[in-house]
């Protein structure tokens, strides 16, 4: 199992956001031992949503697939697969 943090600053995956719609620590995605992805909103100010059946569904926690579109802070959206490619090397 591997956990990646997502946010505006100091996280594994940094989302640039001059408007500060994305929290410093906005969400976490856990890659499970069987290869699934579990997305958790970390109490962000502006929420996390997944696009399902053509509509944005706010989530606190949910399993998501690589091809699903995820939205952070009301405007920053991309597929989970694209997001995972943005991981910083340490």
Locations of regions flagged by a protein language model:
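Short, charged beta-strand/loop "edge" motif centered at a coil->beta-strand transition
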Residues: 2-33
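C-terminal boundary/linker segments immediately following FHA domains
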Residues: 5-7, 28, 36, 43, ...
């Amino acid at each position: 199992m591997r956990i990646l943090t997502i946010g505006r600053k100091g996280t594994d995956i940094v989302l640039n956001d001059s408007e500060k719609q994305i929290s410093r620590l906005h969400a976490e995605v856990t890659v499970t031992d069987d290869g699934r992805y579990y997305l958790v909103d970390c109490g962000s100010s502006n929420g996390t949503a997944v696009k399902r059946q053509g509509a944005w569904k706010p989530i606190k926690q949910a399993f998501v697939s690589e091809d699903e579109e995820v939205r952070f802070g009301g405007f920053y959206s991309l597929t989970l697969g694209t997001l995972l490619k943005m991981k910083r090397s340490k």
